[in-house]
Design a protein with these regions (language model features):
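Alpha-helical hydrophobic/aromatic positions enriched in membrane-embedded helices and signal peptides
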Residues: 1-4, 10, 87-89, 111
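Internal alpha/beta loop-helix hairpins
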Residues: 2, 7-75
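Non-catalytic connector elements of ABC transporters
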Residues: 53-55, 65-180
Length: 180
């Protein structure tokens, strides 16, 4: 039996539905399984809507070999960059759980540490950016990283967040569509 259930609660939608339709202002954005929506969002709206905490959406300058976030260049393949040849800025999407503490990587000024037992959430801004880096509907938000650590960094510390380039989503700023 097919049932259509309408909700504004993403957790409800993700747990109750075999397929979920994400709409924005009455326009269908993407229809897929909950996991596919999470893993391969079609655009910035779906990326920012699905997941709790939400995907980090960070704007950076296109440079040789990748996208510059704060004081670090996240590697992005030439094939992906070629899909947005005229764009000087792209938006990178990184899920909080995709980060690891590392000796090299994206610099984070830790503002808040939320300890949850086996995991901790770090909230902060990118090193070298002079601003909070995550964006959603044009508003700045803190970057969130979920780390598995018994000894998380402390508030005020500066850490490096490693990320596997395969887990980075790249979005066009012109179209808001995912290009990676």
């Amino acid at each position: 039996m097919t049932t259509v259930y309408v909700t504004h609660d993403q957790v409800e939608a993700m747990t109750m539905g075999d397929r979920v339709a994400v709409m924005r202002d009455g326009v269908l954005q993407q229809v897929d399984s909950p996991l596919a929506l999470y893993d391969t969002p079609k655009n910035l709206f779906v990326a920012g809507f699905i997941g709790s905490p939400a995907m980090n959406l960070m704007e950076g300058d296109v440079v040789d070999g990748g996208v510059e976030l704060g004081d670090y260049v996240v590697p992005v393949s030439r094939d992906v960059l070629a899909k947005a040849p005229n764009e000087t800025k792209l938006t990178l999407g990184i899920r909080p759980e995709a980060f690891t503490l590392a000796s090299e990587g994206i610099g984070l000024d830790v503002a808040v540490v939320e300890e949850l037992g086996a995991d901790a959430y770090l909230y902060g801004s990118l090193v070298g950016s002079g601003k909070q880096a995550s964006i959603e509907d044009g508003e700045a938000h803190q970057v969130v990283a979920r780390i598995s650590s018994r000894r998380p960094p402390q508030r005020g510390e500066q850490v490096r967040l490693g990320v596997d380039p395969a887990s980075v989503h790249v979005f066009s700023q012109e179209t808001t569509e995912r290009i990676s």
